[in-house]
Amino acid sequence: MAWVTQAYSSGLSQNSIISLTGNDRTVADGTFNSMIMPRAVIANEREHFMKTRIDKIEHDLSRNAKQEMMDRQSLAEDYSALNLAVGQEIKLDIATQHQLNRLGSSMYKADHEREAELTDLINRIRENEVTVNGILENQKAITAAERADLLLEVVASTAKSVSAAGRAAADGSGVVPVFGPSVANGIKVGIDIADSVAEAAIAVKESGIITQLNDVYHAFQSVHVAPNDIIKPAAVVAGTSTELIGNLQAIYSRLRSHSDIGFKKATVGDVIPHSYMVKPVNSTEYASWQLYVIHPVQGSLGLVVQVMGDALTYNVFAQYGTTSASEFGKTVLTGGATNTALEGTKVKFQTKVTAQQALALTMALKDAASMLSQGELIGYFEQYINLALEPDNLSLQDNMHKYHHLLTSQNSPIDWNYHDEEMHKWLDSRKITNYDTMKQKDGVVIADIHIPKVFNDLRNTTLHCKLEGKQNIAGYTVYEYLIGPWAHYGDIDYSVVVDTLNEETKWYCEIIGIDGHLIIEKSVQHKPEKILELTVNDDGLTSFKGKNHDRLKLKVYVKDSLAVKVFRNWIGINGT
């Protein structure tokens, strides 16, 4: 934007200046646009510089926002084309256990990246404890979102090392990837899964796994949209850095548990139900309503939300304990009467947020219903469940974060751990039922192919994570991996596979704990080398060097490396 600079003469009277510029200090520059919206008059060079700088920042933000939307749209179109090409009714052969393994590994890698970033964030908060405590104690008047931005600013600007600051720096769209992956990493995961689906399509037979993989991917991606938003509910009521860290860990643990269930749903032989919206065929201005039946792929609960005029009601139901995956089970929480028998036009969609996140907004909207129009109620709700975009109404957004924190705290009206575990048990029983039905109909061989017993959930599936080199030291490329934290207890082992240019190259593993480390020398290549076996107790802790740990850090040092992968395998799992 070209700004108009006007020089002032000492001979000009105040009245003549006003007549030239107008009372709002703007002036037309002869263009059609300036006739509609006159440009600001710049009084001096500093003001001109600031105007130009602000304009550039606004332009960059707008451009980045558009690019981010284009990336998401491109990804969505790729998957739409994939579904169109293969067809909704085509059933993929899940003898492709390899494909499910790749899907699980892609999910696990992204999950690991997010956990590693959470650990870095917690370390930065601890390093800046005084500053963080000051923000939490003194900035009570601002919203949770603004307080979260302040905290992230502190973390990014005062981190003790360049690498740590880099991990907390904003990505291309101005979003701090605290709980990464960002949109770019999400696309990498998408590429992995697209490859997996394409390879599996060669073995097309009669399973609905193409739709399942697509649905699980979209749901899995949902927790990575605007990832830094997760810090907002954690910061909304925290009074100290210790409380903030505890809140972050609680929120993340719940997201990870929901991801486990999302993966498991794709392996039991049931069709994953879509969410849908029902609205009147001929809606009128005076008697309008909309009904939302929400089946999040992730997690164990679903919702029915009804907007009738300017009133909002909801009910939370279990997604387990039914004879069909498309039905709801028992009522878990009631927020008014809803009527699922309403008839009208039905629109299917895939929910982009978890039941916990959707419920937090629903509860906030119910509180604010008297101050919002029906259009605002519907608009805020739909953009969140469809796009994971938070409302731009700051008071509503702040209240949503408070409810999100409540739902993840010990005072939550819902016992999420109980329902998640019940969901796991029900999915196990559904798998047995579906397997027996297929065995009677098509025989044991077909049943073994279509409902593989070895895939239950991410907890007891062997998964791999391909590492990326972080730095070079004395000719060695250093790869880092976070071992843990664990949501389950039992025995677990970790193996490393190394490929190098030189078959005789030795490589080294360093396992780092609180007060010590362990160095392991290896030379075997191209096959898994076990480096660690741990016993995790029911508190999610393991003993290393005589002390309990909830996580360890692994570093792998390799010369002339081609690839380094880590395999994780639960030997015996006892629960969650």
From Swiss-Prot:
Gene Ontology cellular component list: viral outer capsid
Please, which domain of life does this record's source organism belong to?
A: Viruses
Gene name of the encoded protein: Segment-4
> Where found?
Virion
The name this protein carries in UniProt is Outer capsid protein VP4
Q: What is the lineage of its organism?
A: Viruses, Riboviria, Orthornavirae, Duplornaviricota, Resentoviricetes
Listed A to Z, the keywords are: Capsid protein, Outer capsid protein, Virion
Which InterPro entries does UniProt cross-reference here? Answer: Seadorna_VP4 (IPR026383)
Q: Which NCBIfam families match?
A: seadorna_VP4 (TIGR04235)
